[in-house]
UniProtKB/Swiss-Prot annotation:
Membrane topology type: Multi-pass membrane protein
Name of the protein in question: Putative multidrug resistance protein MdtD
Taxonomic source organism: Salmonella newport (strain SL254)
InterPro entries reported in the protein's UniProt record: MFS, MFS_dom, MFS_trans_sf, Multi-R_MdtD
Any one Gene Ontology cellular component term annotated for this protein: plasma membrane
Gene that this polypeptide is encoded by: mdtD
The keyword Cytoplasm appears for this protein: no
Entry's family note: Belongs to the major facilitator superfamily. TCR/Tet family.
CDD domains attached to this UniProt entry: MFS_LmrB_MDR_like
Residue ranges, Periplasmic side: 1-11, 70-76, 125-137, 186-196, 246-262, 307-341, 417-430
Molecular function terms, GO-annotated: transmembrane transporter activity
Gene3D superfamilies the UniProt entry points to: MFS general substrate transporter like domains, Multidrug resistance protein D
Lineage of source species: Bacteria, Pseudomonadati, Pseudomonadota, Gammaproteobacteria, Enterobacterales
C-alpha cells in the first residue's frame, strides 16, 4: 500500500467510504424501527417493509451494476451511486408516511446496489495485481466496522435526537464522497457485450412480484385472488427467464453454472439458509425494544456482541472447514443457529438479561461460520470462465433471500400479534415466543439440503479452488 501513488491511495479512500456508508445503513435502521413506527403512526408489525424495500432493490439492481460500470465508466457510476444513495437518505429523513419512506429506501437501494460491486471493480482497475489483496483488505475494513457501529449509533441517535438522523448523517459524507469521486477517480471503461435487458427485466419482475405476493395481504390489504395472480405472474417470469437463458448464449446468468454440483447445492442452501438467518438482525432489536422494553440505545448495544462474534469467527472458519469438511460444518452450524436462537428467546423471557450478550456473541459466531462456508462451497468449484457470473448470482440470491426472510418475519409477527402488541406485556411475550419457534424451524430446515454435500475434506478445501473449463 505504501508504494502506491498518492492519487491511487485517495481513490482507495473514496471506495472505502462508499463501503462504509452502505454497510452502516444495513444495521443502523433496524434499531430505529419501533421509533419510526411511533413517529409515522404505524404499527411496528408493518415496519419490516422499510428493510425489505432496500434489500430487495439491491438484489434487483446488482446484476446491472458491473455492466453499467464497464459501459459508462467506474467514476461516473460510482459518482451516481453516491448521489442516489445520498438523495435517498435525504428523502428518507423527510418522509412523513411509511409509503414515502419505503419509496425513499428504494432510491437508496439503487445507489447501494451499485456502490459496493463498482467499488470492487475500481480497485481491480487502479491497483497492480500484486497489491490487490492488500488494497481490498484496506477498502473492506470500513465495511466491517459499519455493521459494528450501526446498532449502537442508531440507538444513540434515536434516543437522544430522532430517527431522522440515522439518514441525515449520510448526507455530509455523501457530499464529500461525491465531490472526491468526481475530482480524483479515473473513468475507466472497457468494451463489453450487449446487456441482457430482457433477462434482467424478467428476473427483476419475478423477484419483486413474488416478494410482494408473500406479504401483500398483511401490509397492503391486497385480496387473496390478486395475491394468487401476483404469485403466478412472478413464478411465470422466473420460468420465462430460464427458457430465455437456455436459448440465449448472452444471458444475464448462464445455465451452465448449474452443471457444477457444488454450485447448485450451495446456491440452493444459501437461498434457504439466508431466509432464516436474515430474520435475526431485523427481529432481535425489535424484540428487545417492544418485547422487553429496552431503550433504543440499550437494544443497539446488545447487537454489538453479535457483530463481534461474526468478525472474530472469520479468522478461524477456514481451518474448521478444512478439518471437518463442508457437510459437517454446514449441518452443525445450521442446527446450532436454530438452537442458539431458541436459547436467546428462552434467556430473554426468563429475565436473565446478563446472559444475552454471551448468547448473541455465540449466535454471531455460528452465523458467520455458516455464511463463510456457504459462500465458499457455492463458488469453489466453478470454472474460471464462470466465476464472475456465479459470484454475481450468489450476491443477488443473498440479498433476495434476506428480503424474503424479513418479509416472513413480519408476516409471522402480524399473524400471531393480530396487529396489536404492547410494550413488554405477557401477550407480547407470547407473540414473540411463537414467532421465534417458527423462525427456529425455518432456520433448521436447510440442514436437509446441506446433508447432501460431499464431506471429503481434501476435495472441499477452502484455500484452493480447482481450475476447470467446460
Amino acid at each position: 500500500m505504501t508504494e502506491l501513488p498518492d492519487n491511487t491511495r485517495w481513490q482507495l479512500w473514496i471506495v472505502a467510504f462508499g463501503f462504509f456508508m452502505q454497510s452502516l445503513d444495513t444495521t443502523i435502521v433496524n434499531t430505529a424501527l419501533p421509533s419510526m413506527a411511533k413517529s409515522l403512526g404505524e404499527s411496528p408489525l408493518h415496519m419490516h417493509m422499510v428493510v425489505v424495500s432496500y434489500v430487495l432493490t439491491v438484489a434487483v439492481m446488482l446484476p446491472a451494476s458491473g455492466w453499467l460500470a464497464d459501459k459508462i465508466g467506474v467514476r461516473n457510476i460510482f459518482f451516481a451511486a453516491i448521489v442516489l444513495f445520498t438523495l435517498g437518505s435525504l428523502f428518507c429523513a423527510l418522509s412523513g408516511t411509511l409509503n414515502q419512506l419505503v419509496l425513499a429506501r428504494v432510491l437508496q437501494g439503487v445507489g447501494g446496489a451499485m456502490m459496493v460491486p463498482v467499488g470492487r471493480l475500481t480497485v481491480m482497475k487502479i491497483v497492480p495485481r500484486a497489491q490487490y489483496m492488500a488494497a481490498m483488505t484496506f477498502v473492506t475494513l470500513p465495511g466491517q466496522i459499519g455493521p459494528l457501529l450501526g446498532p449502537a449509533l442508531g440507538g444513540v441517535l434515536v434516543e437522544y435526537a430522532s430517527w431522522h438522523w440515522i439518514f441525515l448523517i449520510n448526507i455530509p459524507v455523501g457530499i464529500v464522497g461525491a465531490m472526491a469521486t468526481f475530482m480524483l477517480m479515473p473513468n475507466y471503461t472497457i468494451e463489453t457485450r450487449r446487456f441482457d435487458l430482457p433477462g434482467f427485466l424478467l428476473l427483476a419482475i419475478g423477484m419483486a412480484v413474488l416478494t410482494l405476493a408473500l406479504d401483500g395481504s398483511k401490509s397492503m390489504g391486497i385480496s387473496p385472488w390478486t395475491l394468487a395472480g401476483l404469485a403466478a405472474g412472478g413464478a411465470a417470469a422466473i420460468l420465462l427467464y430460464l427458457f430465455h437463458a437456455k436459448k440465449n448464449s448472452g444471458a444475464l446468468f448462464s445455465l451452465r453454472l448449474f452443471r457444477t454440483p457444488t454450485f447448485s447445492l450451495g446456491l440452493l442452501g444459501s437461498f434457504a439458509g439466508r431466509i432464516g438467518s436474515g430474520m435475526l438482525p431485523f427481529m432481535t432489536p425489535v424484540f428487545l425494544q417492544i418485547g422487553l422494553g429496552f431503550s433504543p440505545f440499550h437494544a443497539g448495544l446488545m447487537m454489538i456482541p453479535m457483530v463481534l462474534g461474526s468478525m472474530g469467527m472469520k479468522r478461524i472458519v477456514v481451518q474448521i472447514v478444512n478439518r471437518f469438511g463442508y457437510r459437517r460444518v454446514l449441518v452443525a452450524t445450521t442446527l446450532g443457529l436454530a438452537l442458539v436462537s431458541l436459547l436467546f428467546m428462552s434467556v430473554a423471557l426468563l429475565g436473565w438479561y446478563y446472559l444475552l450478550p454471551l448468547v448473541l456473541l455465540l449466535q454471531g459466531m455460528v452465523n458467520s461460520a455458516r455464511f463463510s462456508s456457504m459462500n465458499t462451497l457455492t463458488l469453489k468449484d466453478l470454472p474460471d470462465t464462470l466465476a464472475s457470473s456465479g459470484n454475481s448470482l450468489l450476491s443477488m440470491i443473498m440479498q433476495l433471500s434476506m428480503s424474503i426472510g424479513v418479509t416472513i418475519a413480519g408476516m409471522l409477527l402480524g399473524m400471531f400479534g393480530q396487529q396489536h402488541i404492547g410494550i413488554d406485556s405477557s401477550a407480547t411475550h407470547h407473540v414473540f415466543m411463537y414467532t421465534w419457534l417458527c423462525m427456529a424451524v425455518i432456520i433448521a430446515l436447510p440442514a436437509i439440503i446441506f446433508a447432501r454435500v460431499p464431506n471429503d475434506t481434501q476435495q472441499n478445501m477452502v484455500i484452493s479452488r480447482r481450475k476447470r473449463s467446460l
